[in-house]
Amino acid sequence: MQITQGLITFSPMSGSGPRTATEDVTFPNAITTAVALLTGMNVEYSNGDDHHLGNLQVGVSGAILGSNTVRVTATYGLRDWSGNWDDDYDGTVSFVVVAS
């Protein structure tokens, strides 16, 4: 079993959501199975703006790309009760990949 951890950063943005970002993780040995697990998150409205929390979406998934590489996709969205993605939000999503 091989384990590695990572962090995906989402810079401030408004106008759409949830959004996705990827990070490729390379293991020193060949793998045949892998799973990405969410280990933490830091989410906020940018610039210290004070809003109600209407909807928060955070998740991770993994896909094997080659003999020793996994692409981790993080999904993140934060909005208030307006139903629109009109407020700047940013954050980080922490993950671990377990592979064998």
Predicted regions and their residues:
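Extracellular attachment/recognition segments
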Residues: 1-100
